[in-house]
Regions:
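Short N-terminal "domain-start" leader segments
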Residues: 1-34
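Basic side chains
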Residues: 7, 19, 37-38, 63, ...
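A broad, low-specificity signal for short, low-complexity segments enriched in glycine/proline
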Residues: 11-15, 40-41, 70-74
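Short aromatic-glycine-(Arg/Gly/Cys) micro-motifs in beta-strand/loop hairpins
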Residues: 23-52, 65, 77
Length: 79
């Protein structure tokens, strides 16, 4: 099964912030595509997980790109 992933982090010691956000685009067992998201504090288990099912890989990648843009506006950086 093919999987693409990207990790974003937002670290600011002055604000006591150390967060991560990970996106995965993968094919499901039912021949559809999914965008999986995990987020939380760096060094801890993920506090949140979300899966969005998509009809095509292009749709999943588009949703991932939109999420990356949003996270980067909230001071996350690609790691």
């Amino acid at each position: 099964m093919e999987m693409k992933s990207i990790r974003l982090e937002s670290i600011n010691p002055e604000e006591n912030r150390a967060r991560f956000y990970v996106l995965y685009v993968t094919k499901t067992l039912w021949n559809t595509w999914a965008l999986l998201r995990r987020w939380g504090q760096i060094g801890q288990e993920a506090r949140g997980v979300r899966m969005d099912e998509c009809a095509t890989e292009e749709e999943a990648l588009q949703r991932a790109a939109e999420t990356i843009d949003l996270r980067m506006r909230h001071r996350y950086m690609v790691k």
